[in-house]
Amino acid sequence: MKILLEKLQKLERMEEIATHAEADYEREPENAEYAATFDLAYQNEFKAYIEADKYIEYMTDGNIDFMAAKKMIQTKRAELISILSV
């Protein structure tokens, strides 16, 4: 369970980084460095999301499939983190 908590926390960090990078890019869309930074941040966010999703599927031995895990992360993440933090 600790691994899942770490993956969800990593996802939250990657989302924060991507949000800041997106704000910089939107403020100065002609800035190539901001564009590249946002692209990389978004890729890292997506990778963290997929890792958490696949880990839920793995740890439940497929009883929670990829799509159900995706929905859990999108709609019940706070509850998951709360339960796993105990």
Task: Describe each region flagged by the PLM.
Residues 15, 19-22, 49, 53, ...:
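A structural signal for well-ordered alpha-helices, especially hydrophobic packing surfaces
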